[in-house]
Amino acid sequence: MLGIFYKFLDLIYRKKCYFCKSSKEAVKMCSNCFDELDYLPRKINRIINGKKVYCAGIYSKNLQKLIRGLKYHKQSDLAYYLARFMAEYFKNFSENEVFEVVPVPIHSKREKKRKYNHMNLVGEEFCRLTGYCLNTELIKRVKDTKPQYNLKKSERMKNLNGAFEINKDKYKGGKILIIDDICTTGSTFEEMINELEKIGITNIVCLSATTPFFT
């Protein structure tokens, strides 16, 4: 009887896929749902201030849900899956290279509300998967900016002006890889690149999980 009871509890409380609700694999994102994520062509997506920007995946339903769940719905264990998706894409461009990974920072007020910076979590998993070095102290967000998604390109740049502060003492001397979840106009990457170049850091590459221009 006790064995039946524990099996019943396992059915109720076993971890379910956040996407299809299957408990077969007892993971947050089952292999079928992960495999449904589609990569963009493996090439440079755009150039910002002379720096290469790569966008890993098509802005599909599952990738949107993955990012939003991690970012807004306290699904912190989804960070591994986003990091894995990005790492598997980026390995095609980074053979024999070592990067200093810098996640896009969020303001302390927003981090307090969310309980974490989702891109720091992604950065930790990304570096664990790739062997790169994580640096969350090089760039700090000192301005609590408005959400970018409803703003035009010019408004985004104005909104981000003065948003970031660089701590040069925290630079470890490596090639910088800035990572973010979504690259729309590229304004966030551009502002961070500008600030890094002001202190002489010019060896920079950017990587986002997706861009809404490909759905």
Which ranges hold each PLM region?
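Glycine-rich phosphate/pyrophosphate-handling loop used in enzymes and phosphotransfer proteins
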Residues: 1-215
